[in-house]
Amino acid sequence: MSQKPKLKLYMKSKSLYLTLFALVFQCVTFNVLYSQNENTLRIAFWNMENFFDPFVDSTRTYNDYTEDGSQHWTLSRFYKKRNNIYKTILALSEGAPLSVLGMCEVENTFVTTMLFQETPLKRHNYRVIHYEGDDRRGIDVAIAYSIDKLQLISSEVIKIRNPDNKRFKTRDILYAKFYDRQSDTLHCFVNHWPSRYGGEKETIHLRELAAYILKDKVDSLIRASDCIPKIVIMGDFNDTPLDNSMLNVLKAKPPERRHVEDTLVNLFVNADDLGFEGTLKHQYRWQIFDQIIISNSLYNDSKSLRYINKSATIFHPDFLFVDDETYGGKKLFRTYIGPKYQGGYSDHLPVYIDLRSTF
């Protein structure tokens, strides 16, 4: 049997399960006091860790995540991963639609369609922005947004080119411009900067390059505006908030260290204020690589769209963890550890902030 008929049969067999889950979820959340309301825009980001479809892509040499590949990535494993992700998004959004969800490590429009159109997330009216990028493995950044909350004005990708290495390829920065229901403009950037694979010091120049390119785009928005635009920058930066790329190149300052002339405020510096100690764990150490940064114009009191104080959060429900028998405490419930299939969620925790739109 070919892969496409198998897919159709699998989808039919899952439809009853998804319907029942949606009904149960609605019953469970009916009496929950949501922190979101109609004036709130929840902006979230999540590195979904290798969210691949199981089909061979003849245009790429990297096909580890296929049935015959090294990870033995089958259709049933794909659906398990997809279901884990949508349940997490429902919990993260507290039953209401997220206004913006930045994503990274998604392969293509097939996986985003199966996530947002073939699960209970469909009722939240998400639309997805995705461009095929240059990453060798085929993992991209993407944005899902609620058409009930925001209107898309434009989007584009920002390439990260290394003038010293013409063969260098990495993930794009995704930029989108929105209007909210009050016609307030919101600029969003989604990032997945070069990894530390090969050594932190050996690769730091690549993340600093990404920071320079992003800062140049932010500065161009400011030059084109009469006042500082309302900007949200999110992503897996593969650096901490206090690393040089973030603090001195991008110039994203902690709230307590910002000055009037500073444009960007990093809301994910102090773990004590975020509800959890980090977004990923390496051995015994938690770090904050996944961050959301906003413009000063959102941080200061505003008569329109503004940041809700202390809403920055690392989302850490128990179901995203397992016991860490090697280093103690908890670790993230991943899809794989090396080649060994675990059936979990991701190696990163989601993060979010809330904005308030004043009517």
At which residue positions do the language-model features occur?
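Structural recognition of the beta-strand scaffold that forms the well-ordered cores
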Residues: 42-45, 99-104, 127-130, 141-145, ...
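Metal-dependent phosphoester-hydrolase catalytic domains
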Residues: 219-231, 239-359
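Second-shell loop/turn segments in exported
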Residues: 69-76, 97-103, 130-131, 162-164, ...
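Extracytoplasmic/secreted cell-surface and envelope-processing proteins
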Residues: 53-54, 110-113, 137-140, 197-200, ...
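Bacterial Sec-dependent N-terminal signal peptides
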Residues: 1-38
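N-terminal, active-site-proximal structural segment of metallo-dependent hydrolase catalytic domains
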Residues: 33-119, 123, 129-139, 212, ...
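Structured beta-strand-rich core segments of catalytic domains in phosphoester-bond hydrolases
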Residues: 48, 106-187, 191-194
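Metal-dependent phosphoester/phosphodiester hydrolase catalytic core
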Residues: 57-59, 181-212, 216
